[in-house]
């Protein structure tokens, strides 16, 4: 590997480690030890990179994202092998789907470097699901959910609440007013840990833009091959559809039997009501 590229990756990882928040969502800290070979999935912005970087501390691991322009075009096997040759214990690879033939390369790396740590992550469980056929016996899969209300309360108050199962728990009929206020805030913006940042609204928009501009075209390449000039129109129309879905108040659900006859219609426009036929 080019020395300049390696130094760039090391410096970028050091910046990320220095920027880790002091208070992490409990999902991150409740794992005592991660498996040697790990596939981590979860929605964009839920804290996957923070999770892996937190667990990398105290170990000689190198983090990089497969969409880093410095390494695009580099075969994944060759790149990771070079890192191992330099004495690293392992690698953390984010956005793995950007690496060409990633599942084949990871299988070979697992077989050729049995003592090394390889952690990968991606925002698309669809991508990792496709690779699980080759890797299911080699890599442990962990799904990182969006933040729970319990985790949100910890970030807000510093207090750890026990985990409850709704069916096993008697909930108070008159919850504390402050707790209700926290829940309203959680429902509005608290499912991703970066809500505490000053520019969290811009971060949300950046996630939406990346999904529209990168993720959807990646999963629908045939559309872009047939219509190479559709990029702008795709973004415009998909954005309009998303805006309509977010702001529309009317939702109609039709339930029918096997004969196709509509049995009931449910209208949701602030109030949900059923109309039986």
Please tell me what each predicted stretch does.
Residues 1-30:
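N-terminal pre-Walker A segment at the start of P-loop NTPase domains
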Residues 2-12, 154-277:
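Interdomain hinge/linker elements that couple catalytic modules in large macromolecular machines
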Residues 40:
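Hydrophobic anchor at the beta1->P-loop junction of P-loop NTPases
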Residues 48-49:
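Conserved lysine of the Walker
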Residues 60-90:
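Short glycine-rich substrate-engagement loop in P-loop NTPases that contacts/grips substrate
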Residues 92, 117-123, 143:
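Structural recognition of the conserved hydrophobic beta-strand(s) that form the central parallel beta-sheet
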Residues 126-141, 155-157:
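Short regulatory helix/loop adjacent to the ATP-binding pocket of P-loop NTPases
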């Amino acid at each position: 590997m080019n020395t300049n590229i390696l130094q760039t990756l090391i410096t970028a990882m050091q910046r990320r480690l220095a920027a880790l928040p002091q208070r992490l969502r409990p999902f991150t800290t409740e794992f005592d030890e991660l498996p040697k070979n790990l596939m981590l999935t979860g929605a964009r912005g839920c804290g996957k990179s923070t999770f892996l970087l937190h667990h990398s501390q105290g170990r000689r691991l190198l983090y990089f994202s497969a969409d880093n322009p410095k390494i695009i075009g580099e075969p994944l096997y060759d790149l990771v092998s070079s890192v191992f040759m330099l004495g690293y214990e392992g690698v953390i690879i984010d956005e793995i789907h950007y690496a060409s033939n990633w599942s084949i390369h990871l299988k070979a790396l697992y077989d050729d470097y049995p003592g090394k740590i390889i952690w990968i992550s991606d925002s698309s469980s669809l991508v990792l699901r496709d690779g699980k056929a080759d890797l299911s016996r080699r890599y442990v899969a962990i799904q990182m959910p969006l933040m729970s209300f319990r985790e949100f309360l910890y970030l807000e108050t510093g207090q750890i609440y026990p985990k409850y199962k709704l069916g096993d728990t008697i909930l108070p009929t008159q919850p504390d007013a402050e707790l209700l206020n926290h829940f309203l805030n959680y429902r509005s913006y608290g499912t991703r840990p970066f809500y505490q940042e000053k520019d969290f609204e811009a971060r949300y928009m950046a996630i939406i833009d990346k999904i529209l501009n990168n993720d959807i075209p990646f999963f629908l390449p045939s559309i872009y091959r047939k219509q190479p000039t559709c990029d702008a129109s795709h973004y415009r129309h998909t954005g309009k559809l998303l805006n309509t879905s977010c702001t529309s108040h009317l939702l109609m659900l039709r339930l029918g039997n096997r004969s196709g006859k509509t049995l009931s219609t449910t209208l949701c426009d602030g109030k949900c009501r059923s109309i039986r036929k």
